[in-house]
Regions:
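Alpha-helical transmembrane segments of multi-pass membrane proteins
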Residues: 2-227
Length: 227
């Protein structure tokens, strides 16, 4: 793959993080409110409920949770295959851009589907796959390493960054950037979830067009940040 040069200011780093986390927050909220009270990006709770439903012999509910977990997992793997395919052909493409294009197309398509019967499960697993794809595509944004589809690890990293003791001015600057980035991730997830909840009340599943629009903005920024 032809090396990609990144041209991303600190402000663009923060905005990209905010957009990606708002996307995930809105998708997760919409899935929870419209598709049976299940999350598609936060797998810790799904794992706990998978175990609970197994213990209670609620086999279909357990299978739903397991399907979401495996779909998120397969989204991560898909993104890795996309990266490998681009690299093997020496294509001058940005893998993150490809993943965002896929994500936007999927969200737009799902916004116009029904939520009844087996199609509801198909929507859940497809959204989970999309979140896995996004999270792997943006393991780092500029110099910041974080998750954009779920935030438990980001909150942990935020605590570590706040409690750290920088040895010099450069380390202090790096810590400040990490703190702002990780705090932005959490706040944006909250805002995204609010957008998803409000959109769900007004537009039902068509509110998936809200995160799709945010993906388009993130895509435009990604195209500007790299050549």
């Amino acid at each position: 793959m032809v090396p990609l040069t990144e041209r991303r200011s600190t402000r663009q780093v923060y905005l990209t993080i905010a957009l990606l986390c708002a996307i995930a927050g809105s998708v997760d909220a919409l899935a929870y409110l419209r598709l049976g009270r299940l999350f598609v990006a936060n797998l810790t709770g799904n794992t706990v409920f998978f175990a609970y439903h197994l213990a209670e012999r609620h086999w279909l509910s357990a299978l739903e949770r397991l399907a979401i977990i495996l779909s998120f997992f397969s989204g991560v793997i898909t993104d890795r295959f996309v990266q490998r395919w681009i690299a093997s052909g020496r294509r001058a493409w940005n893998p993150a851009v490809v993943s965002l294009i896929i994500e936007c197309g999927v969200l737009c398509a799902l916004a116009f589907l029904s939520t009844y019967g087996s199609l509801r499960v198909a929507l859940l697993v497809t959204l989970a796959w999309t979140m896995g794809l996004q999270n792997d595509a943006f393991q780092t944004v500029g110099p910041v390493s974080l998750n954009t589809a779920f935030i438990t690890g980001d909150i942990q990293k935020l605590g570590i960054a706040i409690a750290s003791q920088p040895a010099d001015e450069q380390a202090t600057k790096k810590r400040r950037q990490q703190v702002i980035s990780l705090a932005t991730a959490w706040l944006a997830y909250v805002v995204g979830a609010i957008l998803g909840a409000v959109g769900s009340q007004t537009f039902a599943l068509r509110a998936l067009l809200i995160p799709a629009a945010l993906v388009l903005i993130a895509l435009a920024m990604e195209l500007r940040a790299r050549n």
